[in-house]
Amino acid sequence: MESRTKLDYSETARSYTENKSGGNDAQRINGVYSSSFFVVDFSLRLLVIGSTFTAAIVMGTNKQTAILPIVGPLSAKYQYSPAFVFFVIANAVACGYTLLSLIFSITGKFTSTPLSVFLLSVTDLVMVALVSAGVSAAAAIAYVGYKGNSHTQWGKVCGIYDRFCHHGAGAIVASFVSLIIFMVLTVMSTYSFYRRTSSAR
């Protein structure tokens, strides 16, 4: 009877030790994942800030005056196209949001609870939609400027306003880069929310 009691005690102690060790391993793995996730998320959001800021500034300061025969001087400015105005606003909003989310991530506001991670993934998705709409509208106008449209008799203007078109193209490329990164961030934040909710069960 005594030997059986000792055997049961030994098995219980071994089981407790294994469970504790397994729990420590899981915590260690989660800790490594969390730190790696933070580094990648932080780096990508820095890139988004840089690309959206560049896109908004380059397009927002884009203008050129050309001298045309008979007509005289004519100016091209981003304000003359509602699509370009929306492009600047969309990238400025995305830049401001990303800066705030970066600050909140550093302080742990967006990574402390599953709800905050869920809100982060939703707002990242909203930014994907906003930047996508802005860059698509600007790209459509830029294409007409480069190629024209023979069906509607819209002529090319980039042969006249070459610098304006080149700067606009650079801003659009920068915005496309930020759009791709936002998509990656949305996937990451959604997966992080999934991990937190599944581990809480």
UniProtKB/Swiss-Prot annotation:
Keyword annotations: Cell membrane, Membrane, Transmembrane, Transmembrane helix
Residues in the Cytoplasmic compartment per record: 1-36, 105-124, 189-201
This protein's GO CC annotations: plasma membrane
Membrane topology, Extracellular segments: 58-83, 146-167
Membrane topology label: Multi-pass membrane protein
Transmembrane regions listed in the UniProt entry: 37-57, 84-104, 125-145, 168-188
Localisation: Cell membrane
Main location: membrane
PANTHER family named among the record's database cross-references: CASP-LIKE PROTEIN 1U1
The family this protein is said to belong to: Belongs to the Casparian strip membrane proteins (CASP) family.
Quaternary assembly: Homodimer and heterodimers.
Protein name as annotated: CASP-like protein 1U1
Lineage: Eukaryota, Viridiplantae, Streptophyta, Embryophyta, Tracheophyta
